[in-house]
Each structure stands twice: as structure tokens, then as C-alpha cells.
From Swiss-Prot:
Residues 21-48 bind DNA. The gene is aoiH. It comes from Aspergillus oryzae (strain ATCC 42149 / RIB 40) (Yellow koji mold). This is Zn(2)-C6 fungal-type trascription factor aoiH. Residues 68-94 are annotated as: Disordered. The lineage of its organism: Eukaryota, Fungi, Dikarya, Ascomycota, Pezizomycotina. Gene3D superfamilies: Zn(2)-C6 fungal-type DNA-binding domain.
Length: 387
């Protein structure tokens, strides 16, 4: 009864989470404590998990010998009471009472892992095809402590005992392979911890996630009027609207900016994809201006007839005329081109740091050509605005 009520009281308390997520704690970096996911985990493309917090880094039954002694005294008192009841009961109930006493002893044992708030398997939450019972036989705790009051060996590792490793594929595979071939006595200190921490701290990002995002954005900003011969979708013959062009371009450049904040941008494959995205955005802006140059200038006071796109603009009840609307569109395009120029500057610095990679020269040449294209579009906007 006392054990059950204690468990109910413990389970009724709100679970307190750690201040740092598992990924930041494993990487030994400061966590921004974002809920439900911190910024570092979002940029790295992994699941953010906050483990249950404890006041000290060891399991509670390792650090509370007084609780073990009090529980043992309660168990002995219950046993004496049940023995007294068994002596005064009829002889035909002796066998049944003995069975109940044995079951009560098992339920009240202070070393039963099911009675703890956190089971012993908390130290091995990584996905593994091996059953939990088999994993327990391979853990750091070789056996449960005996009734003489001896404590189980303390878990020795570079991190606190309450850390639950995140689901990082290469870490999980390495740790599972090590557990299968080593005995519990050898696992008290594993030198591979240092290697895992060093490897993980230098490769925070996942190139696959950034490449997937970049490829999706590249597909969205691709010129819809051009089509591959293998494509089942026919190319569009009409021009994309002004608002759709600006919205797609801004979304694409925001994604490029996010990817540049990830260490994956230091890889040549990711950098080339980002350059392709910027090229598509610049070409969409160029096509927007080129088509307007082909219209008669009598239709608009400006040399660039951006008012051809029937995009209503108003400030409250004040509806803008064609001249004001064209000027605003020119300012918006100029602002977007300036943002592209800043991103190209960041890509240029990344290309300079890739001097040891064979494709660095191609990347640098590509970026220079985009800088030239950006300047030409800006000059075209300025000339049209001056007319």
C-alpha cells in the first residue's frame, strides 16, 4: 500500500524537463531553450528532445541509502504482520497465505526496477532491435544490489547519468555495435565517447536535409515556360503574375539565407545548389523587366511599364495610380536585388574557404557572373526610373 501510494504521488507531480535539450547537451553548446524545439535542432534538421530533469546527475536510488533502509524496515514490519496473521489462521489457508507473502515480498522489494520513477533502461533509449531484457543484461549495472545494503556501481561516463541520447543515426549505430560486443564490466568507461563527441561537434548539420530543401526551392522557382522532354506537364505559355514572381523570389531567398546559417553550406554541393536558386530568381526578375520593355512607352510615363500587371495597390482608401504603382514596384525590386547582393557576398566568402576543394573555381566563377547579372538588373531599374 505504501509503495503504491508513493508511486501515485510521484506520478502525479508535473515532469520537470532539463534546461538544455539532449542535442545541445551532447554537442556541449549553449541551448536557447526553445519549446518545443530549439533553433539549433531546427537548423540541424533533427528532432529536439528535452529529457526529464533530476536534481543530481545519478539515479535517485543510488543516492538515497536512507530511503532504502526505511523501505527495508517497512518491508520487514509488513512481513512480521503477515506471519502473525498466518499463525492464527486455519491450517487449510497456510499454503495460500504463504503464496501471498511471497508475492508481497516481490512487490515490496526496494530493488524492483518497476517501482522507480525512471527505469534502468533510461540510459539506453536509442532504437535497437534487441529486446529490453537483453539490453539490461548488457548495461553498465551488472546486477541488482543485494540485501546487505551494497549499492550498484555508479555509471561512469563523460556526461551526467540522466542524459538520454537523441536519435542521431551514426551515434546510435556506433553505440549499439559497441554494446553487443562488450561486457558490462568493460562499459564503465568507453574511450569511444571522446571520438563520438568530437565527430558530432564538428558535423552538426545534415547535408541531406539542406540538399532536400534546396532542391525543393529550386524546383519551385524554375521557369515554368521551359519544360523537359521527359516531363508530362506541358510548359506554360502565359507570363507569371507580378505578385507571384515577387513572392516566390522572396521565399526562395529566405530559404537560401537559412541554409547559409547551417554548416552544410560549407559543402560544395550545397553551395552550387544555392547558386542555382539565386540564378533562377534573378532570371525571373530579368524576364519581368524584359517583357515590360517590349510594351509601348506611351502606356506609362516610365520607360519600364510595370503597371501592365493589374495588381491593385492602395493606402487605405487611397488608390495608387499607374505612375505611383510603377515607382513602388521598382523600389520593391531594388530592395530584393540588394538582399540578393548580400547573400552573394556571403557565398563569396564561403567559396574562398573552399580553396582546397576541386570545384571551388567553378563556384567562384558562377558567383561572379551572378554579381554581374544583379548589377545589370539594378542599372535597368534605375534607368527606367529616371525616364
Amino acid at each position: 500500500m505504501s509503495t503504491g501510494s508513493t508511486l501515485n504521488q510521484r506520478s502525479g507531480k508535473p515532469v520537470k524537463l532539463r534546461a538544455s535539450c539532449d542535442f545541445c547537451a551532447l554537442s556541449k553548446v549553449k541551448c536557447d531553450r526553445g519549446q518545443p524545439q530549439c533553433v539549433r535542432c531546427i537548423k540541424s534538421g533533427i528532432d529536439c528532445n528535452y529529457s526529464e530533469s533530476r536534481r543530481i546527475g545519478k539515479a535517485w536510488h543510488h543516492c538515497a541509502p536512507s530511503a532504502v533502509r526505511s523501505t527495508s524496515a517497512t518491508t520487514q514490519g509488513t512481513r512480521r504482520k503477515q506471519q502473525t496473521i498466518a499463525q492464527h489462521s486455519p491450517r487449510r489457508r497456510i499454503h495460500r497465505d504463504t503464496q501471498a507473502l511471497s508475492a508481497a515480498d516481490d512487490a515490496m522489494s526496494p530493488y524492483d526496477p518497476s517501482g522507480y520513477a525512471t527505469p534502468f533502461s533510461m540510459f539506453h533509449t536509442l532504437p535497437s532491435p534487441v529486446p529490453e531484457s537483453t539490453i539490461r543484461s548488457q548495461t553498465h549495472i551488472e546486477s541488482y544490489p543485494s540485501l546487505d545494503g551494497t549499492m550498484a556501481p555508479i555509471l561512469c561516463s563523460p556526461e551526467s547519468a540522466d542524459i538520454s541520447l537523441p536519435d542521431i543515426p551514426h551515434v546510435a549505430q556506433l553505440r549499439t555495435n559497441e554494446l553487443e560486443g562488450e561486457s558490462p564490466s568493460v562499459l564503465q568507461y568507453n574511450p569511444s565517447w571522446d571520438r563520438i563527441m568530437a565527430e558530432h561537434s564538428t558535423a552538426i548539420g545534415d547535408a541531406g536535409d539542406c540538399i532536400t530543401r534546396a532542391a525543393a526551392v529550386l524546383k519551385s522557382v524554375r521557369d515554368p515556360r521551359t519544360s523537359c522532354v521527359r516531363s508530362r506537364t506541358p510548359p506554360r505559355s502565359h507570363t507569371q503574375s507580378l505578385d507571384a514572381t515577387l513572392d516566390d523570389g522572396r521565399t526562395a531567398m529566405d530559404t537560401v539565407k537559412d541554409i547559409l546559417a547551417c554548416p552544410c553550406a560549407q559543402e560544395i554541393r550545397v553551395a552550387l545548389l544555392l547558386v542555382l536558386i539565386i540564378q533562377q530568381v534573378l532570371e525571373s526578375y530579368q524576364a519581368l523587366l524584359t517583357q515590360q520593355h517590349d510594351t509601348p512607352r506611351e502606356e506609362s510615363p516610365l520607360g519600364i511599364n510595370l503597371s501592365r500587371y493589374d495588381t491593385p495597390m492602395a493606402i487605405g482608401r487611397y488608390l495608387l495610380d499607374n505612375e505611383l504603382r510603377s515607382k513602388i514596384i521598382v523600389q520593391v525590386l531594388s530592395s530584393e536585388l540588394e538582399k540578393i547582393g548580400l547573400i552573394l557576398d556571403i557565398l563569396t566568402r564561403h567559396a574562398q574557404s573552399m580553396a582546397h576543394q576541386p570545384d571551388e573555381l567553378i563556384l567562384g566563377t558562377y558567383i561572379d557572373s551572378l554579381q554581374t547579372t544583379k548589377k545589370e538588373v539594378l542599372e535597368s531599374l534605375e534607368q527606367g526610373n529616371d525616364i
